[in-house]
């Protein structure tokens, strides 16, 4: 990327000026989010030319109450990627802005009858001739491959499962790497699809796998855990072969073996609308079906907040269950 330009967001601090007299003692605090009836934040993207010291505002066709959730550098110094959302967050636009002319060109639009998930922004990666995109346009989160001109090259993944993370593209052999919940909505595994479309599962253990690939895409460090397995960290090559085990947590497992730790149990249930959902429960260690116990339920249901996962952890809920309280999620 050219070093001639730097990019920044003006930060909205409210319509009223700050009160300097209150800076040393508790007083009024100015929030960037307006209350009902007050004007919405006005956002822009600007570039600053280091040589000429000129600041330019990009001619971005953004709704007056729209959002700019991300800006990203591409491999082309004349193409700054700007991502926008409308106020209802059900329409996503990707623009390429020229930092000198300030012109912005719409490269793609993705819409949802519900809302656009945040992980879409963070899974867009740019290469010299292509860029990646996650979309739920067919009802499931899948990986799409575009030219830098905004043309769809191909849909990389297919099926009744969700791609969770796009890990990267090997420019040498044309392979794509990603994680998905193809095995189970509770789990996350690592996959590779080569340029001929052949899919290979790289992770060996069932649970939650979180890989971090090298820049060359030849190696990755994998963090794995499951309901009954604390985090295991390994170094792997891009065929999935384990080259070295970095962290085993054997000492932790040995220590925990001396305690009666409440364990999560997975279950499924069906809503009145016929939708099958997953849940977990945690009972006291010496649970007896003939006794009555206080029950607590954890519930959030916000976007991007999946709570029922095949992953390891000890939490406040574990402590409360050890006191004789049952939990449901």
Model-inferred region functions:
Residues 56-59, 104-109, 153-158, 200-204, ...:
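Beta-propeller fold detector
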Residues 49-53, 98-102, 147-151, 194-197, ...:
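Short loop/turn segments that connect beta-strands within beta-propeller blades
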């Amino acid at each position: 990327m050219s070093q001639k330009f730097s990019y920044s967001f003006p930060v909205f601090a409210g319509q009223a000026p700050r009160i300097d007299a209150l800076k040393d003692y508790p007083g009024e605090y100015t929030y960037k989010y307006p209350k009902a009836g007050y004007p919405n934040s006005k956002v822009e993207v600007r570039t600053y030319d280091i040589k000429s010291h000129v600041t330019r505002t990009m001619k971005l066709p953004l709704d007056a109450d729209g959002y700019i959730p991300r800006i990203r550098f591409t491999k082309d110094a004349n193409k700054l990627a700007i991502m926008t959302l409308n106020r209802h967050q059900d329409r996503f636009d990707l623009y390429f802005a020229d930092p000198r002319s300030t012109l912005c060109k719409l490269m793609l639009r993705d819409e949802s009858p519900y809302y656009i998930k945040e992980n879409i922004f963070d899974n867009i990666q740019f290469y010299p001739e292509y860029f990646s995109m996650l979309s739920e346009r067919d009802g499931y989160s899948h990986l799409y491959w575009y030219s830098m001109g905004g043309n769809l090259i191909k849909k990389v993944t297919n099926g009744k499962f969700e791609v969770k993370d796009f890990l990267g593209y090997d420019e040498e052999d044309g392979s794509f790497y990603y994680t998905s919940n193809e095995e189970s909505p509770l789990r996350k595994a690592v996959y590779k699809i080569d340029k001929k479309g052949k899919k290979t599962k790289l992770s060996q253990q069932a649970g939650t796998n979180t890989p971090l690939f090298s820049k060359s895409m030849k190696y990755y460090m994998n963090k794995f855990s499951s309901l009954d397995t604390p985090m295991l960290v390994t170094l792997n090559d891009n065929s999935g072969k384990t080259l070295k085990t970095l962290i085993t947590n054997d000492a932790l497992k040995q220590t925990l073996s001396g305690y009666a730790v409440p364990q999560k149990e997975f279950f499924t249930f069906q809503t009145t609308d016929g939708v099958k959902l997953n849940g977990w429960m945690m009972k006291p260690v010496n649970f007896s079906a003939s006794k009555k116990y206080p029950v607590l339920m954890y519930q959030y249901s916000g976007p991007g907040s999946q709570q029922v996962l095949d992953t390891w952890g000890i939490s406040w809920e574990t402590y409360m269950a050890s006191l004789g309280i049952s939990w449901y999620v």
